[in-house]
Structure formats: structure tokens, C-alpha cells
């Protein structure tokens, strides 16, 4: 047999073998900010990322997101964290309110003794400024203090309001998991 026949036979055999595997019908899209993927109703509050692997004594960023909101003029968010494992290093305004015609007010309070951070974002005045859609309300930089797993959860006191200060029902809450090693 000639060398070209052997090479051709090997290539054709390889193609038959490699094409024999079926492609799995699994969904590979698992973005926690995709409203078709989340397992709760909208509007909702969630975190991104929802799973964080961090080294002990290192910083990591997490964003608080409002998903599927309509006519949002203000938000009050309380995020609970394990005070023995995490420490808030910085909190700053996200991008959802920053795209509006009016500058928003952003205020936060970290209660490290009880393990929560309150974040208030709103528009002031009677201009009826509001935003809609999905976007970041705040960015928080945490420092991991100890090795282990801890959760970041939203408190039931969280509130979203429209320009007339009417509550917008929050139908879902995501949570985050921090694994520090």
C-alpha cells in the first residue's frame, strides 16, 4: 500500500469516529442576569457574580442588580453578610441610575457589628425622573477575613419605589455565595 492510501484511510477513519458523538442538548447559558434563566419572578434584586472564590485577606467586587424594573425612581437595599468572614471595604453607585437626565443621590451605611450594609439610591425633586430595565444599583468591595463559605442575602426590608413614592413589588431575590480559601 502506498503512503498516501494509508494517510487517507487514517483521516477518513478519524472523521467517522469523531463525527459519531452526539452534541448534548444542554443549555450552556447560565448568566444570572438573564431574565430567561433566573428562577424567580421579576422585578427582582440579585447579585453578580453569584458565586465568588476569593483568597483570604483579598478584596473582591460584587454588584447589586435590579432586574426587570419599570419606572424606578428610588431604591433601599439591605444586604446581609457574615461579619466574621467578610468586611465591607468600599461601596459606590452602580450604573442604573447614572444614565438618567438627573444626578441621583447615593448614600450607604455599613453596620459591621450586625453584618449588613444599607444602600439608598434615588432621584430628588418633582421631575418624575425614573429608569427602567436591568442594571447595577451599587458596587461593593468586600475583604474576605477567614477561610470558609458564607452567603450574601437581601433583607426583607428592601424597597423599590416609583417617582410618586409608590412601592414597586420585589418578586424575587437572588443570593451570593463566597468561598474564601
Named regions from a protein language model:
Residues 1-18:
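Sec-dependent bacterial lipoprotein signal peptides
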Residues 19-181:
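Acidic, low-complexity intrinsically disordered segments
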Amino acid at each position: 500500500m502506498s503512503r498516501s492510501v494509508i494517510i487517507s484511510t487514517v483521516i477518513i477513519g478519524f472523521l467517522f469516529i469523531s463525527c459519531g458523538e452526539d452534541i448534548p442538548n444542554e443549555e450552556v447559558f447560565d448568566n444570572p442576569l438573564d431574565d430567561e434563566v433566573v428562577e424567580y419572578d421579576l422585578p427582582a434584586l440579585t447579585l453578580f457574580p453569584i458565586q465568588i472564590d476569593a483568597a483570604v485577606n483579598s478584596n473582591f467586587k460584587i454588584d447589586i442588580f435590579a432586574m426587570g424594573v419599570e419606572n424606578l425612581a428610588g431604591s433601599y437595599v439591605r444586604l446581609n453578610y457574615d461579619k466574621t468572614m467578610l468586611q465591607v471595604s468600599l461601596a459606590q453607585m452602580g450604573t442604573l441610575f447614572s444614565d438618567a437626565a438627573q444626578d441621583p443621590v447615593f448614600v450607604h451605611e455599613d453596620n459591621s457589628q450586625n453584618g449588613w450594609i444599607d444602600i439608598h439610591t434615588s432621584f430628588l425633586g418633582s421631575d418624575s425622573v425614573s429608569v427602567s430595565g436591568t442594571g447595577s444599583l451599587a458596587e461593593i468591595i468586600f475583604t474576605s477575613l477567614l477561610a470558609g463559605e458564607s452567603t450574601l442575602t437581601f433583607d426583607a426590608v428592601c424597597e423599590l419605589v416609583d417617582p410618586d413614592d409608590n412601592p414597586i413589588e420585589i418578586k424575587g431575590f437572588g443570593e451570593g455565595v463566597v468561598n474564601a480559601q
